[in-house]
Amino acid sequence: MKLNVSFPATGAQKTFEVMDDHKLRHFYDKRMGAEITADHLGDEWKGYVFKIAGGNDKQGFPMKQGVLTNTRVRLLLKKGHSCYRPRRTGERKRKSVRGCIVDQNLSALALIVVKKGEKDIPGLTDTTVPRRLGPKRASNIRKLYNLTKEDDVRQFVVKRPLPEKDGKKARTKAPKIQRLITPVVLQRKRHRLAIKKRRVESRKEAEAEYMKILHLRRRQERIRRRSRLSSMRDSRSSVGEERDKEKEKAAAKAAKKVAKKEAKKEVKKVTEAAKKADAKAKTKAEPKKAEKKAETGKKTAGDKKEKKVEKKAAPAVAKKEAPKRKPEAAKGDASAAKKEKKQKKK
């Protein structure tokens, strides 16, 4: 198994090939990120502490942190996941990765020196590999040279020498410092703040104007609602008055009808009482009339007999006189006579 050991203090890294399983078994069943002593690798590694950074199996599949197994699995990976670099935006792909637990099937194991031991390792701790580029951010440059905010960062930029050309001066290349505070940056900041302030003020004015219009509209709506309610109330009252008038008229008509009926009843009672009184008076006056009629009848009969006797005694020479009409009996007398006959029969 190959051990890729890196030393961040000098920036150097070196590969060591270890074939003895007795030396490697101390790494087995350890997970990525675990720290382990390197004393078992030999006396030159005494006091060194390693941190397991990763590795590859014999087929070249990388170890992935968080996959708690010592075998190979297929995971659906997307942008931001380790062991995968998307070729298109939003692309996802199922890739084979190895678990984060170390075993004997690995071909290479990446280790980081966390603590340096007693002895130097040749090619790892005794050599320094300078960085090709220096820090670019202003805060990192200040941190590297322990500068304050008042110091000018531009004088401490790490410059890179360019290859010399024939007959020309040596040139250097310096990176553009990012997050460097200059008068232009401060001016832009003031401009942004002024725009923001103006935007806030305009928003407040627009809000005040809107609230003013809203209060006006609400007031108009309240007035409109009140007028509508009052008109509805008036219409209801007018309708109620009409209904009351109609009811009063209907009640007056009903009272008139009742009064007429009562008057008719009283008239009927009076007429019936008068009829009864007339009938009683008639019943009392009927026998007197009958007696008078009987007397008058007797007189008329005697007169008729006398006239007959006179006719017989008259001479034949005498002129014939026109016959006199018999006096007709009064209708009341005839009816009285009929009533008497009926009473006699009874």
From Swiss-Prot:
Keywords: Phosphoprotein, Ribonucleoprotein, Ribosomal protein. Ribosomal protein S6 is the major substrate of protein kinases in eukaryote ribosomes. GO terms for molecular function: structural constituent of ribosome. InterPro entries: Ribosomal_eS6, Ribosomal_eS6_CS. It comes from the Eukaryota. Residues 231-251, 260-331 have a biased composition (Basic and acidic residues). The keyword Phosphoprotein applies. It holds the Pfam family Ribosomal_S6e. GO terms for cellular component: ribonucleoprotein complex; ribosome. GO terms for biological process: translation. Residues 224-346 are annotated as: Disordered. Component of the 40S small ribosomal subunit. Plays an important role in controlling cell growth and proliferation through the selective translation of particular classes of mRNA. Belongs to the eukaryotic ribosomal protein eS6 family. This is Small ribosomal subunit protein eS6. The lineage of its organism: Eukaryota, Metazoa, Ecdysozoa, Arthropoda, Hexapoda. The gene is RpS6.
